[in-house]
Amino acid sequence: PVSNSFQVSSTMSNLNGKVWEQYVGANASLVSSDNSYGIALYQSYRNRNPYDADNDGFSELGKLNMNTFGLRSYYRPTQFSRISLEYHTTNEFRRGGNKFDLQPHETDITEQTKHIINSGGPTYDVFFNEYRHKLSVYGSAQHTDRNSDYGADKNANAYGKTKDLTAVGGAMYVGN
């Protein structure tokens, strides 16, 4: 971020008088007067009930509930160095099919996913030779927790689960 700012937005929509969808989002940036530190934040929320366009009991648009949040911050300990930190998270639930009041394996057909994703990492930058050269040392990690059901005909074995952790680290030198 390079300046202080704040924004909030919200929408509410309706599909053919049947289903409501809500969205709320916000962004903020805060920067010190000498630009030695700053942070940018974002958030969003979206919610939609399932939509059955032709009244056959099956959704054309599935149920959706999503929350996201993230930030990027920096601190300049000296004129020629910067420490940055990022963090992002997503929590999302989606479900399509029919009989939404029942468990997924009790329906005729269900496609359902639930994701919780967390990621982030630090970076350290050092600038040399009047900013013509830069050395960056960085790391990041992401954890994904996913539960799913892709089943038909009341299949109790259609559930899936994934847990994954990924990490990356490295260094990069750039010179002009």
Language-model region placement:
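Short, intrinsically disordered, charge-balanced linker/junction segments flanking boundaries
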Residues: 1, 147-149, 167-176
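Outer-membrane beta-barrel translocator/receptor signature
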Residues: 1-55, 62-69, 80
